[in-house]
Structure formats: C-alpha cells, structure tokens
Amino acid sequence: MCLAFGWAAVILVLQTVDTASAVRTPYDKARVFADLSPQEIKAVHSFLMNREELGLQPSKEPTLAKNSVFLIEMLLPKKKHVLKFLDEGRKGPNREARAVIFFGAQDYPNVTEFAVGPLPRPYYIRALSPRPGHHLSWSSRPISTAEYDLLYHTLKRATMPLHQFFLDTTGFSFLGCDDRCLTFTDVAPRGVASGQRRSWFIVQRYVEGYFLHPTGLEILLDHGSTDVQDWRVEQLWYNGKFYNNPEELARKYAVGEVDTVVLEDPLPNGTEKPPLFSSYKPRGEFHTPVNVAGPHVVQPSGPRYKLEGNTVLYGGWSFSYRLRSSSGLQIFNVLFGGERVAYEVSVQEAVALYGGHTPAGMQTKYIDVGWGLGSVTHELAPGIDCPETATFLDAFHYYDSDGPVHYPHALCLFEMPTGVPLRRHFNSNFKGGFNFYAGLKGYVLVLRTTSTVYNYDYIWDFIFYSNGVMEAKMHATGYVHATFYTPEGLRHGTRLQTHLLGNIHTHLVHYRVDMDVAGTKNSFQTLTMKLENLTNPWSPSHSLVQPTLEQTQYSQEHQAAFRFGQTLPKYLLFSSPQKNCWGHRRSYRLQIHSMAEQVLPPGWQEERAVTWARYPLAVTKYRESERYSSSLYNQNDPWDPPVVFEEFLRNNENIEDEDLVAWVTVGFLHIPHSEDVPNTATPGNSVGFLLRPFNFFPEDPSLASRDTVIVWPQDKGLNRVQRWIPEDRRCLVSPPFSYNGTYKPV
C-alpha cells in the first residue's frame, strides 16, 4: 500500500518553520560547513605570524622576496566524520583552516599549504598537498596585489620612451596623466611552458569600461624573478607588428616607420557628444513610461523561509551554505522532506577560452579560480541584483590581504514568484463551461551571489522549487574581453567599434554534485527511448512503430564518463537501492542545460589544467582526495597543474551501490556582437542543471503546498473558490480573486 499523504504531512510540518527543528539536523551542527568568522581568521593569522620558523611578513610589503600568508579559508572536514556527527550524534570533527603561504624569501621560493587548527584557538599546523607527490611551483601562484603594484611601476618605467607616442596616438599616458591615464589588463597563461611567468599586457585607456578601449599596444613582460630588477620587457606588439623593446618602437615611430592609428578622443572638452559607448548611461529611445515604476516583489508578512546561521529552511527544503574564498558558492546537506538528496553541490571552476589575432587574444585562457573566483563577491544592489525583499548576507574573505576583509551584501536569499504556475489544469466540460479549474502558484527560493572577475560578472544561483526540484544556474554578463581591431582579427571575432574586436570565446563552468539520494549508497543508470516496429495486435495486416524504454546500468567509472561529441542520454538517474511503492528505485534525475562543446584537443598543452572540460558528465566514486577539480595554481601552471581531473578516472572504480559524485560541465560559445556593447546581457547567456525527483516520492510533494487554488462551477451565483490560506488573516490579506471559466462565441 502506498501512503502518499504521509509525504505531504512530513513536508507540511517542514513548511511550518517554527516546528521544523523537531525533524531537522540541529542548526548548530550545520556550523561544520560554515565559513570562518572574522575572529577565526584573525586567530589563524595571529597564530601563523607568531611562528618564527615561518618568517612571515605582511602581504602588502612591496616585495616578492618575502614570506606571506595569501589565503585563509575553512578546510572542509572529511565527509565520513561529518556524517557521523550529523546522523549518528558522534563528536564533531575539529574545525580547521586552510592557509596558503608564499615562501619568497628563500633560495628556492615555493608555495605551501597548511591545515591550522583546532579553531577557535589553534595550536597545531600540518602541511597539505593538492596532489600526492606534487610540489607547488613558485611560478604557479596567483598574482598578488603587491606583484600588481610592482608590475604597474615596471611597465610605467619601461614605457617612458613611448610617452610622446602615447600622447600622439591615444591622448593618454602613464605619466602625469590625471584623468587621462593608461592602464593595462594582463592575460594568462603566463608563458608557454611550466616554470615561466611571462605575461602579455593589453594597454588600455582608463575610462569608464576601459576593457573596451585597447590602444593597439600589447607588451610581453618576464616577471618570474623575485627581484624586480631582473624583470624585463621581451616584446611589444602594435597594430599588427612586433618590436623587440620600447626603445625600438619609439625610435621607429620618431622617424615615421610605424603604421600608427590615432584614436578618437573619448573625453572631448566643450562639446555636446553622446555618452561613451562603453558607458552605462542611457541613450536612445525606450517607450516604457518613465513616470511609472516597474513591478516589485513584496511580502507584507515577511519571508516564508527561515535562516538559522548558515542553514536555510524553506517548504520541504533545508540546506547549509558557504562562500568558499577560492572557488565560490557551495551548498551542503541538501534535504527535502527530511531526507538527504545531496551532500554537496558546489561551483568548482569557471573558464573562458579565447581566440584572437593579437598575442594577448590568442594567449588568453582564463581559469578563474586562479583569479580569486570566490573572493570577488562584491555588494549586491537591492532591486537590481536581488529583490528589495531579499535577505542580504555578508561575507568575510582573507585573500591577498593581512586580515579578514568584509564584503557587505555579498549574498542574497529571497523567495519570488516565477510568473508561471508550478502546475495547472482547466478541466473543460466541452459545453462552454468547465468541471473545475486548479492551479498551484509558482514560487522559488533563490540563493545568489556574484563573482566579478575583472571584466566578466558571473551570477550564481541555487534555486529551490516546492516539488522537490533544485536548480543550479549561472548567468554571464559584464564586459567582453576585447582586443584591438585589425582586419585579420575578423577570423577570431566581431568588430564592435572602430578600433575594437570582440574575441570569440567559450565559457565553461564545472560543478561538483555529491549525490546522496536517500543515503550514500547510490547507483547510476540512464533511460533512453528506442523505437520498435511490430505487428499491430488489433489489426494484424498493419505495422506499428512506437517508443520503448531502454535502461542502462553503469558499473564502472569509465562507462559513466561521457565525452563531448558522444551522445549523452537525456535521463540521467542516481538511484537508491530503496524502491517506491510502485516497485521503482527511488531516484533523482540530473537534467543538464548547456550548449558547451570541447574547445581544446585532449592532451594539448594547457588542456591538462582543464581535463574536466572533456566531459559534460563524469560519475565517480567518492574519494577524499578528489574533493576539487581545479586549484588556485592551474591557471599559472596549466602545463603541470597540481589538480588533474582526468586522474580521478584512472582507477576506474565500481560505481554500483557506492557513494557517487557527478561532475557536470556546462557552458556556451560566445561570439561577441554589437549588442554586447556596453555589456553582455543575461538572456540567452545562462547555463546550469536541475536535480529532479524521479520516482523518489509516491506523488508530487508540492501537494503539501497551501498555495493551491481550486475553482468549482456553481449553477447559481459565484463559482466556489477553494483556497488554503492561514486562518488568521490579520497578517496576510489575499488579493481579490475571481474566476468565471466559461467560453462562448462572440
């Protein structure tokens, strides 16, 4: 017997958040997933600074020949220890921090990671290794603020011979420039082989949206030494030609041997001109009345979700979150109806792989964890980034600093109407009326943050529906990465302005989805449709073609690693050994929304840093040594990265009735177009995936929602509207509702 109403009862209890604690993991336990507090960060930093053998100096010291702490973040405990703590009431694991230290003040500089604990009063330290037997190279480290300051002054000094050249061709300079200064954007990887630190810099005019204002000059600088005096400019590229050094370009310019391009003045004086094309200032006609405000989300009685520390309760859902400084947004212990659906769903990496005609354009392969993907989570604007009704949450990062840095309103949490019913039906009587109408309002809960990695803005969402569906979504916006226009560049992009080329690129995002569908013992299977041709049983002289189900069970990791170009089945199921009352394995379906393709050939030079990008989906057995598919260091040493996802698959482990992890790659090709000026817009530039219950419940769990409306026709008078709303209407006044349901000729 299938007691469907039992699920609805459980979820209804969970919707009454005041009683949720009786069936939830206690909120204080969720702190096992929480980011470090400012006090904990300070305690770790103080502990490290006081260890004389480390010889630490402040990060902001203007030298690279120093030892300094680059990153402090929470070190996630082992899963088995956390589950024993959450599910069995065992002692909680030690709370620890991960600390990344740059050791530059020694003969052989290196980067070393440490675990520091226990918090809040640390007294021990132990070395960590991203990959057994692999030592982090000095050249693989991310660039620090101190290094950027040194780079700016080095470029400023090195280009002094070009001062007049800059003034004549751009109207801007590096010297005495006030509001007409030049700046630069650096690209990566930094060289062509492991151990190098040779960066190309795009020289730009520092105006609003300077990413769209290249000057035509790009500079290659070797900055691999800890001694700035050893840094040197190796090459320059200007308007299609290479030069050995600034002096050569200046000399040839002085005698008229350089094919120069004089740029128009973006800041004219005393003239009425439209706003700069890279500006957000409105221009043109838009026929929506400006004296009428747009729609707003309102919740007059307050939120229907509950936030307890880092744990969120909403309808049948509960989950904990953190904002990992190095890689970004993560959610843990995802439960619906009191049962675990996933242990972790997290952003692992975001890359943008470019093509171009200029050296910087062709070199650019951005691997954004190497640029602080999780730490560039700046303030969200009410009414724009999130509804005004959202709960805004702060973040604290220690990334390239000397203490915790407060990022106000770095995340937001809100419920919103979707504008489409979760489900509805009009039951016609086919006589001009109806038997009944029923509908359930569509609402979702959204947890959101953003990452602004220089020019690009990524909007990261985790979305929760009342029918047990969860969605992960990324929207891409911000400025395109652009280079100087040359006719040859049209093979690699689109001309966006007189001297501007928007370069072709592919965005790829990698997620880790640790599925725990009603427990840690899961299996992976797919369902596909096959056509069968058979004799029609009720008309033997005719044939019948119809779809049939074909189920495939996967037993090894290699079988469940789907490469791009290979057909990926539409129904990807993670199943519990438990069966529902109809005899089907209780499952969750992974549904991927993506237009990604393979960009780099397998094994090609820098591709080793992003081998996860070979697979839209790979399913592996859980291993503690396989917690992350990328690292801080893959960007600047992609030729010998410390984390190589392909190695996760080499042991080809059994994946039947095991603790399974789905690694999901989503993305899209972006060929810039004129409408990307000033910014790429979000419509059409979002990708992600859904986790959908598939025979997990005996019926739709959203039946527990009291947002349902049913209308019954009446022979006389008004139709009867059946609603389930709180008895106490003092705090909730429903808007007027009427429904006729008839249809007739006119």
Curated annotation (Swiss-Prot):
* Annotated GO CC locations: bicellular tight junction; extracellular exosome; extracellular space; plasma membrane
> Per its Swiss-Prot or TrEMBL entry, what cofactor is needed?
Cu(2+); Ca(2+); L-topaquinone
Q: Where does Ca(2+) 2 bind?
A: E557, F648, N651, E653
Family statement: Belongs to the copper/topaquinone oxidase family.
How many and how are cofactors bound here? Binds 1 copper ion per subunit.
Query: How does it sit in the bilayer?
Result: Peripheral membrane protein
Pfam families with a match to the protein in the record: Cu_amine_oxid (PF01179), Cu_amine_oxidN2 (PF02727), Cu_amine_oxidN3 (PF02728)
Primary place of residence? secreted
Tell me what controls its activity. Answer: Inhibited by amiloride and amiloride analogs.
* Glycosites: N110, N269, N533, N740
This protein is called Diamine oxidase [copper-containing]
Q: List the disulfide bonds.
A: C177-C181, C386-C412
- Which residues of this UniProt protein bind Cu(2+)? H505, H507, H670
Gene Ontology terms, MF aspect = calcium ion binding; copper ion binding; diamine oxidase activity; heparin binding; histamine oxidase activity; primary methylamine oxidase activity; protein homodimerization activity; putrescine oxidase activity
Chain's gene name:
Aoc1
Summarize what the UniProt record says about post-translational modification.
Topaquinone (TPQ) is generated by copper-dependent autoxidation of a specific tyrosyl residue.
